[in-house]
């Protein structure tokens, strides 16, 4: 049986994502999950929250975007990317020691490329930025937190012809998702990307 690693920046298991991946990959592939927040206390998780007043421009200039992820109980948290990078490295090492053939990050955030990894490490963001503009010229980007809007506009605007960016947290109910979908239709988006979900 082939083993692949999957790192969530929240807690594992990701019962909202991995079962669908498993169906696509089939029974001959074992997905070994590792959560960056696994084993941390509520206080330790709270310490990873973004600092400051929530201004994404300040964080962008400092170089530490906000990431959002799911906890095991279905709730969600926001984290400052810079604060979780050492924890990501530990999960990479954990999965390497488990004998995985490659590791997939279950996050579309743009991560630095200085992780030490002996197996291929796949970042969905790189795939999306290459593939999505080939599929459509008018793109709808859905991001879970308002503080991510400016970063998403800047990053996706560099690779797409026309970008509409909306905010709706998938972990907080469907109302925001419906409003975002209406905005995408109004703006003529040909495809919708769930960015940082």
Language model features by range: what are they?
Residues 1-79, 143-173:
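N-terminal glycine-rich anion-binding loop in soluble enzyme alpha/beta folds
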Residues 2-3, 99-101, 137-140, 189-192:
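Short active-site oxyanion
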Residues 5-9, 14-15, 181-197:
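Extended, histidine- and acidic-residue-enriched regions that form the cofactor-binding/catalytic faces
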Residues 43, 86, 170-182:
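Structural motif
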Residues 75-124, 190-195:
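N-terminal glycine-rich phosphate/adenylate-binding segment common to multiple enzyme folds
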Residues 95, 156, 183-184:
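Generic structural signal for hydrophobic
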Residues 102-111, 115-174, 178:
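Conserved mixed alpha/beta catalytic, RNA-binding, or beta-rich assembly cores of soluble enzyme
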